[in-house]
Regions:
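Alpha/beta-hydrolase-fold enzymes
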Residues: 10-12, 16-26, 216-304, 308
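Conserved alpha/beta-hydrolase
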Residues: 154, 159-182
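Short beta-strand/loop motif that positions the catalytic acidic residue
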Residues: 326, 332-334, 338
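Short alpha-helix in the alpha/beta-hydrolase fold that links the catalytic acid
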Residues: 328, 342-351
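Catalytic nucleophile-loop/oxyanion-hole region of alpha/beta-hydrolase
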Residues: 149-154, 177-212
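Short beta-strand element of the alpha/beta-hydrolase
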Residues: 138-147
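An N-terminal hydrophobic leader/cap segment in hydrolases
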Residues: 2-119, 124-134, 275
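Catalytic active-site module of serine/aspartate enzymes centered on a nucleophile-bearing elbow/loop
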Residues: 357, 361-396
């Protein structure tokens, strides 16, 4: 394990991934010139816009736009919505069944826990979890924002490690994830996730006045947390943020994909991009952790949806242009063998951020899901130690 060290070696190939499942789209260097690619992208984008206008006009003026066809379309939408609502009910029931405490050999309960629903920024129901020390006041709170396609219940072990050290833990399932509302694996906007985090922070501050609060985000959740920290009204509520394997730099499968992604995300936002459904990249060196993840019915394992992929590209572009604006105390952790997100981007964050209090951990040979690696307890202890040191700095 290294502190503040770089990751050696360049790569001729990058990956775009769905984050939680390790599905990838290879990113190859283009053989075309930059100017040629730009011209081609503009031409393709223009063509798509004209096609959209043509289809829209025919749809409005054509014979299909009859009362009977509209009624049929309405029935299809209602059936689709009913199926989505049924899936949400199924997932919420599964989320309630997730084990919230580990077996204690001595039969003692050192943690109290609860699950609850919070109305999100758009009145969507957010499924949340709480773990807290059973016999002591919380000396701090960590809010966990999971990665793409997973859910908050996976962080039980780390949560109990935190409560043992006197920290309370809140965790929220994103929209379209775990027990929260929304189509499974579909994220209309990662800005919605930021707004929902703000709603949860309101509740936490109201219930725990004066208790210092940290945010932790994993993978795409790390990108969301980093962007959230750039908003002053969120930044002022936090003592610091922790980022594990953050998705800061993500490239599309081809430059043209980046050019047309905004259009496709509007035309067919929920379409599943099966070309990205490639398996084989391990995210942990612990076989038991991999088995638990991919056999979990609350982990989305289908192809990434078009709008979701576009949102990842969008937040990545935003962050890369705003690293110098980061001022919040932060700790970033990354495995050097991570093939899902780029450890070099974490190094860039550490180098460019304006934060006075910043720390970095690079773990030689470790993979993407750091809190599910065999050394998870050591990594968790380093995070807790960083929070302790940050709190001491605030009192100086």
């Amino acid at each position: 394990m290294e502190r503040g060290a770089g990751v050696g070696g360049g790569q001729d190939e990058m990956m775009m991934t769905s984050g939680a499942t390790g599905r990838i789209v290879p990113v190859f260097r283009s053989v075309l010139s930059r100017r040629a690619l730009l011209r081609l992208a503009v031409a393709v984008q223009t063509l798509f816009l004209w096609l959209l206008l043509l289809v829209d006009r025919r749809r409005r003026a054509g014979p299909d736009a009859s009362p009977s066809s509209e009624a049929g379309s309405g029935k299809t939408r209602r059936r689709r919505m009913a199926a989505e609502e049924e899936d949400v009910r199924r997932r919420r029931a599964l989320a309630e069944e997730v084990v919230m405490e580990e077996d204690d050999a001595e039969g003692e309960r050192g943690t109290r826990w609860a699950t609850f629903l919070v109305p999100g920024a758009r009145r969507n129901a957010l499924f949340c979890r709480l773990w807290a020390p059973a016999a002591a006041e919380m000396r701090g709170i960590l809010v966990i924002i999971h990665g793409l396609n997973e859910h908050s219940g996976r962080y039980l072990h780390f949560a109990e490690q935190l409560t043992t050290c006197g920290f309370g833990v809140y965790a929220m399932d994103w929209i379209g994830h775990g027990g929260s509302d929304g189509l499974h694996g579909y994220v209309p906007s990662l800005d919605y996730v930021i707004e929902d985090i703000e709603v949860l922070l309101d509740k936490i501050m109201e219930e725990n006045p004066g208790v210092p609060c940290f945010l932790l985000g994993h993978s795409t959740g790390g990108a969301v947390v980093l962007k959230a920290s750039l908003y002053p009204h969120i930044r002022e509520r936090l003592e610091g943020i922790i980022l594990t394997s953050p998705a800061i730099r993500v490239k599309p499968a081809h430059p043209i994909v980046g050019a047309v992604a905004p259009i496709f995300s509007l035309v067919a936002p929920k379409f599943q991009f099966k070309g990205a459904n490639k398996r084989g990249i391990p995210v942990s060196r612990d076989p038991a952790a991999l088995l638990a993840k991919y056999s979990d019915p609350l982990v989305y394992t289908g192809p990434i949806r078009v709008r979701t992929g576009h949102e990842i590209l969008r937040i990545s572009s935003f962050l890369l242009h705003n690293l110098k604006k980061v001022t919040i105390p932060f700790m970033v952790l990354h495995g050097t063998a991570d093939r899902v997100t780029d450890p070099l981007a974490s190094q860039d964050l550490y180098n460019e951020a304006a934060s006075r209090h910043k720390d970095m951990r690079l773990y030689d040979g470790f993979l993407h899901d750091l809190l599910f690696e065999p050394e998870r307890d050591e990594i968790g202890a380093e995070i807790i130690d960083w929070m302790d040191r940050t709190l001491r700095l605030q009192t100086v």
